[in-house]
Curated annotation (Swiss-Prot):
May carry a lot of separate O-linked carbohydrate chains distributed among serine and threonine residues. One of its GO terms (cellular component) is host cell surface. It is found in: Host cell surface; Virion membrane. This is Major surface glycoprotein G.
Length: 391
């Protein structure tokens, strides 16, 4: 009998397994890979757009806060109080307004009480003008401002506090109170200080404080008559002498003022210097207005500058507040610009109904205010609130 051959066709177990996994891969693995790739691309695109937007905002904020376009700035929003409570004048070249929100940028630090007095740059630079403006626009000096716009407002600064007080028109002579209406409130530039016989006269009538308290007294007339004789403060006699005079003679000046702040300072008379022509203009008994109109800069700048500031160690000289030596805020301030539109803001829930004053300054402390930034102060009705803004 013959044999027959049979052919059996099929697949082995190995081929079956390979085919199974290839089928799984075609169905699921490809879908997973594509999903992961799409998700990664989406996240990357979203992050890129966010970074671009953030960099744009930061650049605008940096340009606004780091530029040298304006030295001073205030917030400009709709007033929340009556129009009569809004400051009507431009004090020292600064325009203030009561605001609903406070201007700031990015990193904000609130501080009560501490003026960071360890840095003479901050204390001398800002307090020279900004705090006086804050006093004038605050509730203390604005209470009777509409009735008596010529009243003087004083600002006293010490190590950790600022005191504002208002002197009524009755306590000052008529020529002193009427003088600010004839003068330009803008501060002269430091280019004009060469012809000024008293380059440091900005603090002449205000720099006699106790040697244990670091501070100065500013009035609404500081900076308007630098070339004239010292201005008569409340409590001075009729011959034109102020509480900072250094002439010898009987100390029969009144020792009390309207607010009783300077009764101790008028008794601390410094011995006269050896110059023969020291403040001869103050020895006349002519009225103040006549004396000022006939005053001629006959004294040398050296003699005048020696007499303008006391020799105490703790006195603040506002001229030298800038470590770079480029700006002297007591002599020159930047122009106010109300057309700034690009502003980075963070709402500071303080001082919602009181004025705010901001300026660019140099910080040495605290640690997050070490660079040139905006420094702002406002009055919350109890005391001064300070915050800083870094870009």
């Amino acid at each position: 009998m013959g044999s027959k051959l049979y052919m059996v066709q099929g697949t082995s177990a190995y081929q079956t397994a390979v085919g199974f996994w290839l089928d799984i891969g075609r169905r699921y693995i490809l879908a997973i890979v594509l999903s992961a790739f799409g998700l990664t691309c989406t996240v990357t695109i979203a992050l890129t757009v966010s970074v671009i937007v953030e960099q744009s905002v930061l650049e605008e904020c940096r340009n606004y806060n780091g530029g040298d376009r304006d030295w001073w700035s205030t917030t400009q929003e709709q007033p929340t109080t009556a129009p009569s409570a809004t400051p009507a004048g431009n004090y020292g070249g600064l325009q203030t307004a009561r605001t609903r929100k406070s201007e700031s940028c990015l990193h904000v630090q609130i501080s009560y009480g501490d003026m960071y007095s360890r840095s003479d740059t901050v204390l001398g630079g800002f307090d020279c003008m900004g705090l006086l403006v804050l006093c004038k626009s605050g509730p203390i000096c604005q209470r009777d401002n509409q009735v008596d716009p010529t009243a003087l407002c004083h600002c006293r600064v010490d190590l950790s506090s600022v005191d504002c007080c208002k002197v009524n028109k009755i306590s000052t002579n008529s020529s002193t109170t009427s003088e600010p209406q004839k003068t330009n409130p803008a501060w002269p530039s430091q280019d004009n200080t060469d012809s000024d016989p008293n380059p440091q006269g900005i603090t002449t009538s205000t720099a006699t404080l106790l040697s244990t308290s670091l501070g100065l007294m500013l009035t609404s007339k500081t900076g308007t008559h630098k070339s004239g004789p010292p201005q008569a403060l409340p409590g001075s006699n009729t011959n034109g002498k102020t509480t900072t005079d250094r002439e010898p003679g009987p100390t029969n000046q009144p020792n009390s003022t309207t607010n009783g702040q300077h009764n101790k300072h008028t008794q601390r008379m410094t011995p006269p210097p050896s110059h023969d022509n020291t403040r001869t203009i103050l020895q006349h008994t002519t009225p103040w207005e006549k004396t000022f109109s006939t005053y001629k800069p006959t004294h040398s700048p050296t003699n005048e500058s020696d007499q303008s500031l006391p020799t105490t160690q703790n006195s603040i000289n506002c001229e030298h507040f800038d470590p770079q030596g480029k700006e002297k805020i007591c002599y020159r301030v930047g122009s106010y610009n109300s057309n700034i539109t690009k502003q980075c803001r963070i709402d500071v829930p303080l001082c919602s109904t009181y004025s705010t004053v901001c300026m660019k300054t140099y910080y040495t402390e605290p640690f997050n205010c070490w660079r040139r930034i905006w420094r702002c102060l406002c009055d919350d009705g109890v005391g001064l609130v300070e915050w800083c803004c870094t870009s």
